[in-house]
Amino acid sequence: MSNGIVIIGSGFAARQLVKNIRKQDATIPLTLIAADSMDEYNKPDLSHVISQGQRADDLTRQTAGEFAEQFNLRLFPHTWVTDIDAEARVVKSQNNQWQYDKLVLATGASAFVPPVPGRELMLTLNSQQEYRACETQLRDARRVLIVGGGLIGSELAMDFCRAGKAVTLIDNAASILASLMPPEVSSRLQHRLTEMGVHLLLKSQLQGLEKTDSGILATLDRQRSIEVDAVIAATGLRPETALARRAGLTINRGVCVDSYLQTRNADIYALGDCAEINGQVLPFLQPIQLSAMVLAKNLLGNNTPLKLPAMLVKIKTPELPLHLAGETQRRDLRWQICTESQGMVARGVDGADQLRAFVVSEDRMKEAFGLLKTLPM
């Protein structure tokens, strides 16, 4: 009898893979193992839970039991995988083990918490489970410090501000979204956040946190400090690679895979936030969806390479939403920016006047798909 496919993880990547496999094969044994409850929720919703007044349990879309019944799965929630014996093709936990024919690592990524004194006082919002652990503190907090001005930090800053909280956002960079676009493009959102009342501390560094009788004292550089009720780390994600490393797989920033989502071991694959595909870590929904479609085919005997088109990234800041695509972080692009009351269109062109990237906002976002078609593959 076939041992089938074992998937470690239960997030968006794992679920997309299950759905794509079941479209093609209704009977191959599928086993999912994960440390969480395995209930389904929409992770991007975490950026808006405070202004929406949602509790962690409100985010659940489908329970683990319903998922198992719908897709004919064996599920092992609240289970920590401790080891992979790649030679014997066995996955082990403290109390169990599973034989596999093919293994998929969909272990995701964890929130990076800056290594400063008092780092244990920082909260993270990278999962329903993490939100459940701190939802009361966040709901009751009047003053919130967000560490990190990237995509998630900017979304959270706007959300907490919309919920009526006093928000401070701190980042080492000179502008928000610095890893995604140049300051002349992000300045529109930066100005809107300031208008809403977000206190931006750019070119600034958090040096430590300390619990006080009235909150948390955050010590900053240049002999500054502020007191808040909650501190959230939004300083990026780190792919979960420890299990893959113990299995002897190649690790760089993530678990290294080729265009077929295959690791150096022919029977082990990686998908989603933990995977580094030909040198790229792509922690966004669309590349994960496309990767899951390709991997499902390959696990069932095909040999299909992943080919990713130019894709949109959406920044969900409702007061001033943005869509971007292409090589927006390239330093050599010349930006042509058209700004009006209805929104902004920023085109990044190279030395040959070829469009390489764009950012659109508000009502001008309807132009995104037309611009997307003109980007080189």
Curated annotation (Swiss-Prot):
It catalyses: 2 reduced [nitric oxide reductase rubredoxin domain] + NAD(+) + H(+) = 2 oxidized [nitric oxide reductase rubredoxin domain] + NADH. The keyword Lipid metabolism does not apply. Keywords: Cytoplasm, FAD, Flavoprotein, NAD, Oxidoreductase. It is found in: Cytoplasm. Pathway: Nitrogen metabolism; nitric oxide reduction. InterPro entries: FAD-bd_OxRdtase (IPR050260), FAD/NAD-bd_sf (IPR036188), FAD/NAD-binding_dom (IPR023753), NO_rdtase_NorW (IPR023961), Rbx-bd (IPR041364). Its main location: cytoplasm. The keyword Disulfide bond does not apply. Signal peptide: none annotated. It holds the Pfam family Rbx_binding. One of its GO terms (molecular function) is oxidoreductase activity, acting on iron-sulfur proteins as donors, NAD or NADP as acceptor. It is an enzyme of class 1 (oxidoreductase). Its cofactor is FAD. Gene3D superfamilies: 3.30.390.120, FAD/NAD(P)-binding domain. One of its GO terms (cellular component) is cytoplasm. Its EC number is 1.18.1.-. One of at least two accessory proteins for anaerobic nitric oxide (NO) reductase. Reduces the rubredoxin moiety of NO reductase. Belongs to the FAD-dependent oxidoreductase family. This is Nitric oxide reductase FlRd-NAD(+) reductase. It comes from Escherichia coli (strain SE11).
